[in-house]
């Protein structure tokens, strides 16, 4: 992520296109807050010869067989259907999911484009041209900052976490470390203001 001159809003977001798929990472997962608490969802991937080790992230295929997509969309509707902005934004996300891109990279790219636009983040989206350190100044490298198996909320650890209203916060209190759709469905157009004052 390349930060703007004010070092607050990214002017560009780069996705790492030259890594191999990392098992048990956020690349095919998301976390939402439902009526029973945090829910972790995984998008199943196609295993080549019984494995996915060493497969470039841009070549990894999604396994669209089975019932998981219907269950995932149902979970989103249950978790956020009563949120203030669900009806305004959900169709865009549902359309991406229903398009069933064959590769995980394409799904993640479509979701990131949609999220940046919906959140009102004025940033260009691109992909890396090689693996390694970026020589550009003002780059915030977050490739290893987040992992579902580490229970550290990156924002909270850096003193940046700030609660916002969540549908189930009366039951669970504020729950950090969730997908950006949680912020979007609950805060809507105010999401960009929330992000700017982190």
Predicted regions and their residues:
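Residues lining hydrophobic/aromatic ligand-binding pockets adjacent to catalytic sites
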Residues: 1-198
């Amino acid at each position: 992520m390349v930060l703007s001159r004010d070092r607050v809003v990214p002017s560009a977001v780069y996705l790492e296109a030259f890594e191999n798929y990392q098992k048990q990472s956020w690349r095919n997962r998301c976390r939402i807050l439902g009526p029973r608490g945090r829910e972790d969802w995984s998008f199943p991937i196609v295993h080549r010869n019984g494995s996915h080790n060493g497969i470039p992230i841009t070549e990894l295929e999604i396994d669209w067989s089975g019932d998981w997509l219907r269950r995932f969309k149902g979970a989103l509707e249950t978790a956020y259907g009563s949120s203030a902005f669900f009806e305004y934004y959900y169709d865009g996300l549902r359309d991406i999911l229903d398009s069933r891109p064959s590769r995980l990279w394409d799904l993640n790219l479509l979701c990131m484009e949609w999220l940046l636009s919906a959140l009102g983040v004025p940033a260009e989206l691109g992909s890396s041209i090689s693996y390694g350190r970026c020589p550009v100044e003002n780059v915030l490298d977050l490739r290893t900052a987040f992992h579902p198996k580490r229970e550290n909320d990156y924002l909270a650890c850096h003193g940046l976490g700030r609660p916002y209203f969540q549908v189930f916060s009366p039951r669970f209190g504020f729950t950090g470390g969730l997908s950006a759709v949680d912020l979007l469905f609950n805060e809507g157009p105010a999401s960009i203001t929330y992000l700017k004052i982190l």
